[in-house]
Each structure stands twice: as structure tokens, then as C-alpha cells.
Amino acid sequence: MLGQRDILLHLVGLMEEYKIPYLLTGSFAVSYYGFPRATHDIDFVVEIHLAEKSNILKLLQRLGPGFDYDEKLVVKAIESFRQFAVFHFDTGIKVDFWIRKPGEFERNKFKRSRIIKIGNKHIAAVSAEDLILTKLVWCKQIRSERHLRDCVGIIKTQQKQLDRKYLKLWAKKLRVVEFLAEVKESDYSGY
């Protein structure tokens, strides 16, 4: 039976084969940079344009039995820079593919990506700073204690490695300065 890590590695291999630029994000990235947390999903940001939709559709067809997705929703997600999901019913794992939106911050995520190692595979992941900023932007829309807790864990774990100048600059540009101050001053146990 496939596990979450097996599915992650399988997908990364296929994205590399089909030359689809990707970043691992979400709970896997949070667990790598901060405090681990259990989840039944895998999140990727993918850079794909409508003209290249056949690549992602071919990749999805190669996933194998047990995986389910809606091809129309995939195309719609690419057209509207949204997200689509793939489900693996045997394990209950959901894989979210977030289409990279236009804009400087979103482009920066790919320029500033980090290579992390999971198993024997090198995987492109969102940087710790961009993961924090993304979660704070989501909190600006709908406050989430889980996202704030994730940010606290990343900041506490990555203290010396964080590019604080970049965080401060982009917190201002993204209008999340108050959230950044809140998580920098927070005690993890207080959430």
C-alpha cells in the first residue's frame, strides 16, 4: 500500500519527467522548516500555462489506479490561477496543486526555492520566508490559528537562517506587518 511519502516522491518524479516547475509547500514544508504536524494532504505550487496544459494532463493520466481527479476542473484551475485536487482513495490522501499566480511575490517563490531531501530524492521546496509570508497573507483573508502556529514554529526553528530583511520588506508589501509582528513575539505554547 502506498504511503504519503511514496505518493509525494511519485508525483515529484512525474513533474520532473514532464518538466513542470513545482515547489513543495504546505504541511510537508512546514514540518521541514518548523514544528512537525500530521496531515493527510500534499501541497504543490506548479508553474503551468494554459498552452502547456497537456503536460499536466499526461502526468495525471500516468498516476495509476486509485487516483482520481476531474480533468475539467484541472483546466479551469489553470485558466483562473486557482487550485485543483487529486485524491488517492485507498489512503485518503489529497494532493493540492496550486497554479502559480502572476505577480512578483509568486515569481520570487520559484526564484528563491530551496532544495530539500526527502528519502533519497532532492525536492524543490518553497523557502521558509516565503512559506511564512504566504501563510500570513491567508491569515489576512481568514485568520487561522493553525497557520499562525506554523509561522511561529518556522520562526523559532529557523531563527538564525531566516532572511529577516526579506521578511520585513515583503510583509510590508503584502500588508501583513501586524501578523508578522504577532508571530515573531508569540510563544508557541500560547496558541
Region spans (language model):
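Compositionally biased terminal segments of proteins
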Residues: 1-191
